[in-house]
Regions:
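C-terminal accessory helical subdomains adjacent to catalytic cores in phosphodiester-
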Residues: 1, 14-45, 56-182
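Catalytic nucleophile-elbow at a beta strand-turn-alpha helix junction centered on a G-D-S/GDSL motif
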Residues: 6-15
Length: 182
């Protein structure tokens, strides 16, 4: 079985890698191990996980993962939306399609890490946007859905993926937390 370490930015991505991708790829002899981004460690040793605060943190974590010689590949699953300002290439992103901008940043990331086993992956739209592919499924996920779930579905049903993914207060995770906190 070939081990691939997947550096993920949040719990949603971690769950997706563990519960969806890994079982599927294990049939082909590939074991995916999600590694959740660490945001800080206190003096007492408590580690806080989830979220990308700086590229310095990402770089340190990815280089540490590459020290695991039992992994055939190290990759990432991070949202293009909200990358930190110090991310490689972010200040020089060319005008072009969103796909071209993502490809440019992935290449800058790959060149900065500069390791043959590193394959960066940035998701163009926040991963949580997949939850809105069939918004009515959000309500069906609850045995006793709160009224807020229906309000969320009504709101996002009128929007395109680009509109759902726009801004600090309107990106998918923010919308979900606003209607369904906790």
């Amino acid at each position: 079985m070939k081990k691939v370490l997947v550096y993920v930015e949040g719990q949603t991505e971690e769950t997706f890698v563990r519960d969806v991708l890994d079982p599927h790829l294990s049939l082909q002899g590939i074991y995916l191990k999600p590694i959740l981004a660490r945001t800080k460690r206190t003096r007492s040793g408590t580690v806080f996980k989830g979220g990308i605060l700086s590229y310095k943190q990402v770089r340190r974590d990815v280089l540490r993962l590459l020290e695991d010689s039992s992994a055939v590949q190290v990759t990432t699953m991070m949202d293009y939306y909200g990358l930190p300002d110090d991310f490689p290439g972010k200040a020089e992103v060319p005008v072009g399609t969103p796909y071209q901008r993502v490809a440019f940043l992935e290449d800058a990331f790959r060149r900065d890490i500069d390791h043959p086993r590193f394959l960066p992956f940035l998701t163009l739209h926040e991963f949580e946007a997949l939850l809105f592919a069939q918004p009515e499924q959000i309500v069906q996920a609850f045995s006793d859905p709160p009224k807020a779930a229906s309000q969320l579905v009504e709101e996002v049903s009128r929007l395109s993926p680009e509109e759902i993914n726009e801004g600090n207060d309107t990106h998918p995770a923010a919308r979900i937390l606003r209607y369904l906190p906790g």
